[in-house]
Swiss-Prot record:
Site-annotated residues for Reversibly protonated during proton transport: 60
HAMAP family: ATP_synth_c_bact (MF_01396)
One CC-aspect GO term: proton-transporting ATP synthase complex
Originating organism: Shewanella sp. (strain W3-18-1)
Any one GO MF annotation of this record: lipid binding
Gene that specifies this protein: atpE
Transmembrane regions listed in the UniProt entry: 10-30, 53-73
Keywords of the record: ATP synthesis, Cell inner membrane, Cell membrane, CF(0), Hydrogen ion transport, Ion transport, Lipid-binding, Membrane, Transmembrane, Transmembrane helix, Transport
Protein name stated in the entry: ATP synthase subunit c
Oligomer status and interactors: F-type ATPases have 2 components, F(1) - the catalytic core - and F(0) - the membrane proton channel. F(1) has five subunits: alpha(3), beta(3), gamma(1), delta(1), epsilon(1). F(0) has three main subunits: a(1), b(2) and c(10-14). The alpha and beta chains form an alternating ring which encloses part of the gamma chain. F(1) is attached to F(0) by a central stalk formed by the gamma and epsilon chains, while a peripheral stalk is formed by the delta and b chains.
Length: 84
């Protein structure tokens, strides 16, 4: 039983860590491309900014889903029920 709990804790840590890393890399690429496009065509900056915020919200949603799944595994671990 302790093995299942410890492996679940490791899986949760990896899940949250990779979600944070992916979100950080995504924001870095998104911000860089937004600045590059705004510098190239300044008249499109407001339209690009709206699209950037939409994509930023979707990037945040991915990490929030990972946190939700991780909390599910921490507090309602389905693997403990199989042990008996």
């Amino acid at each position: 039983m302790e093995t299942v709990i410890s492996f679940t804790a490791i899986a949760v840590a990896i899940m949250i860590g990779l979600a944070a890393l992916g979100t950080a890399i995504g924001f870095a690429i998104l911000g860089g491309k937004f600045l590059e496009a705004s510098a190239r065509q300044p008249e499109l900056a407001p339209a690009l900014q709206i699209k950037m915020f939409i994509v930023a919200g979707l990037l945040d949603a991915i990490s929030m889903i990972a946190v939700g799944v991780a909390l599910f595994f921490v507090f309602a671990n389905p693997f403990l029920a199989q042990l008996g």
